[in-house]
Amino acid sequence: MPQPKRGRPRAFDRDRALLDAARLFWRRGYSGTSTRDLTARLGLSTSSLYGAFGSKAELFEEAVRTYAERYREIYEQAVAAPDFPTVVERVLIDSVHEFTRPDDEHPGCLLSSAAMADSTSTLDTSAYFAELQGHNERILRARAERAIEEGELAPDADASALTGLIQSIWHGLSARANLGADRADLLAVARLGHTLICGPPAP
């Protein structure tokens, strides 16, 4: 008697699994996230979880790096914009949309959450976060300097101070998102920040 055909197993999407793990660490913290929590969220057996990622600490490290790349991409795409007001808009507005993605269980940014503080992984999270922020600041400052050179910004504009202001608003949005602020409130703040930096839109 022929055996009934079984459905094909669900394909393993590593990037999706890493983002799901990141959101779980984000919501519960590193210490508060158990292996059972991870297997349930990712739909993997314990042996498959360890086979794919090695250990909880290694999964955390890879999840942090994968999540961080999303913000690196936001900045790199932003600075490629044709004008500086659009650069600022993309950095702030696109980040708010990322902080508050509908499929997240908790809003905000993993890299600035408590999950980083209680991690016992070998990843130096503080140094890694500093490196990422340093990269983002450098490319944003270079874009501001170009805007000054091309006459888009006033010749006496301070590119470093301007970059610091944008980054400060970004960090504030991230912190408020971690505290549960909703998307509409964060977008209002981001848009006000954009207006203060770039001026009101032309009528």
Task: Enumerate the predicted regions with their spans.
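Generic hydrophobic, amphipathic alpha-helix propensity
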Residues: 13-22, 38-39, 63-67, 71, ...
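Helix-turn-helix
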Residues: 16, 24-58, 62
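Amphipathic C-terminal alpha-helical segment
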Residues: 98-102, 116, 146, 166-183, ...
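Hydrophobic alpha-helical segments that form the core
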Residues: 94, 107-116, 157-176, 188-196
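Amphipathic alpha-helical segments used for helix-helix packing
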Residues: 88, 102-126
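Hydrophobic alpha-helical connector segments
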Residues: 76-107, 159-166
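N-terminal intrinsically disordered/low-complexity leader segments
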Residues: 1-12, 201-203
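Amphipathic alpha-helical packing segments from all-alpha helical-bundle domains
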Residues: 90, 123-150, 161, 188
